[in-house]
């Protein structure tokens, strides 16, 4: 192809944007860990990303319109990263990848619990979680009666509670 891409295949083009070994992990940490500052992403990465790699991937994700960057209103010297709708639409991809990994690879109990719950919840749960992400990252209010708006805990809160429960159980055994 003359536009610098290997081919016009949608899978190839997607991999050219998020197919490196860090981009989807950064997006995962923003979605599931609500990590929105450079330092949070750097210091709380399960995989231990290097600062130069994080900076490079954030730059790419910004250029591709998957993230936005703004001055943090609570701290003028910090930037806050937000997912765009394009970034939020990657949730089903991450959920499917996590489900596949949970099914076929030796995942840890604490890091596998979210994958298990997302697989069990399916697209209905993903849509509810995407609505929560839109509220957090885009300022779009969730519909009345949605999970976390008077109808029980949010999907994000349920995923976090399940994770913390598994971590606590493992600590008791240790």
Feature-to-residue mapping (PLM):
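C-terminal regulatory/oligomerization modules of transcriptional regulators
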Residues: 95, 99-174
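Extended, folded domain segments that form the structural surfaces/walls around functional sites
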Residues: 35-43, 86, 90, 99-103, ...
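N-terminal leader segment of winged-helix/HTH proteins
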Residues: 1-18, 160-174
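Basic, amphipathic "hinge/linker" alpha-helix immediately C-terminal to the N-terminal HTH DNA-binding motif
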Residues: 19, 73-97
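Canonical helix-turn-helix DNA-binding module
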Residues: 46-76
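N-terminal helix-turn-helix DNA-binding core of bacterial DNA-binding proteins
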Residues: 9-50
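Short histidine
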Residues: 5, 22-27, 37-38, 129-133, ...
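Short, contiguous, well-ordered secondary-structure segments
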Residues: 1-5, 14, 29, 65-71, ...
